[in-house]
Every structure is written in C-alpha cells, then in structure tokens.
C-alpha cells in the first residue's frame, strides 16, 4: 500500500457527533472526501443541513438526530447501524459546548453539570455505544476532540468547568486506548488551540481577548476548523496505525510556552 493510500478510508463507516457545523462539519467533509460513508449525529435536521449538502458532491452522508447526553439514543443509533450490516468503524467525538468568563465561585451547579454532561459524559456514552461493535469486529478508530485547555489554564478568561471537562476527555482517551488496544481499537485525541468558529467569534468579550491569545501563541494566529479536521483524518486513518493514547496538539505552538 502506498503512503497516500494509507490516508484513504474506502469501505469505512464513520460517525461524527456534532458533524453538521464548524469543526464537526469539516471532519465530516474530510472523512467523506477520503472515501468513508459518514453518519452525522446532530440535535436536529436543521443543524445537519450543510452536512447533507455534501451529497451534492457525491459523498455518502447520512444524518441521525440525537443528543450525545442521551445514552439510550446513542445505543439505539449504534445498534441500528450494526444490525443494518454496516457498523461504525470510526467514531469522531466532536460534539461539545464552551464556557468562559465565569469565575469558579460563580458557577452554578447547573453550569458545571451541563458542561460535564456534554463534554465528558457524551464522549463516554458514544464511545461505549459504538465501541461495542468495534470490539466485536476487532477493529476501530476513535478520535476525541479535546483541547489545549485540558493541559493548560487559559488566560485572561476563567473557564474552570471547560478546562476540567477537556482534561477528563484526555484521560478518558488514554484509559480507553489502554483497555481496548487488544481489541484492535485505537483511541486518540486532538487538542486544538483557539479556533475561528462561531462559538468563539460570537462571544463579544473575545474581541478584547484575541490579541492577548495571539501574543501567547508562537505562530501568532488562531486555527481553522479545516486544520483540526486534517489532524482528525490522520488519526482516523491507517497512516496512524501505530498511534493510540496520543493527545495531539493542534495549537500553533501555544503549549510550548
């Protein structure tokens, strides 16, 4: 097999949570372009419109409506795919929410629990649901969306709940990688820097923060969703066949300083 062919995903079936927008949409596009059939999980059909539009380019993209915090729904989708004869061989746990600017002492119980439910529980529910069929097949690749915030403490904005949720995702990644390696399943994560997404740009306070972020970044720029998706594609592909338990920084050098 040529080196270029190692990046191909022909015959694979990928599931991308939150795959209809921003980073998730780019992951959907990257995997589909590499030859995978992609199932996007979004909370509504409307959220998946851009992903479905990829069909116009000849890509195999389907949508399932569901919330990653609903473990039973994730189990049902995984079972449906497996019973239909095309179980997921790739899972990208992309769905997540952000939170910044709230001091720890002002976080409500609801703020904290919501962050953990989406960013951590959702990753585990999906990994467990789709991992079962991967275990049966003795192969699979899971890529989690972590964050550099799982390693460092951001400034100037306080974001304790988000940071903790992503640190937990990183260790969940390592734990599943160690436990499932003998099943032929690789589990890795990407840890992006600040990315130009609607979630980041829409926060008015970030207009003052961005110059400070860039001053803390060796490459002096934010990332793009496409750059994150490229790393996800690599980890999902055979080109990363010896990698498991890795947390890959896609951070413009932010964590170097």
UniProtKB/Swiss-Prot annotation:
Catalysed reaction, written as an equation: galactitol + NAD(+) = keto-D-tagatose + NADH + H(+)
Keywords: Carbohydrate metabolism, NAD, Oxidoreductase
GO molecular function: galactitol 2-dehydrogenase activity
Domain of life: Bacteria
Residues annotated as transmembrane: none
One GO process term, biological-process aspect: galactitol metabolic process
UniProt xrefs under SUPFAM superfamilies: NAD(P)-binding Rossmann-fold domains
Signal sequence coordinates: none
Catalytic residues identified in the record: 162 (proton acceptor)
Cofactor: Mg(2+)
pH dependence: Optimum pH is 9.5.
Co-factor: note: Binds one Mg(2+) per dimer. Can also use other divalent cations.
EC number: 1.1.1.16
Temperature dependence: Optimum temperature is 35 degrees Celsius.
Binding-site residues, NAD(+): 21-23, 67-68, 94, 162, 166
Family the UniProt entry places it in: Belongs to the short-chain dehydrogenases/reductases (SDR) family.
Quaternary context: Homotetramer.
Function, in words: Catalyzes the oxidation of galactitol to D-tagatose. Also catalyzes the oxidation of a wide range of substrates, including polyvalent aliphatic alcohols and polyols, to the corresponding ketones and ketoses. Galactitol is the preferred substrate.
Protein name from the UniProt record: Galactitol 2-dehydrogenase
Organism for this UniProt entry: Rhizobium johnstonii (strain DSM 114642 / LMG 32736 / 3841)
Name of the gene: gdh
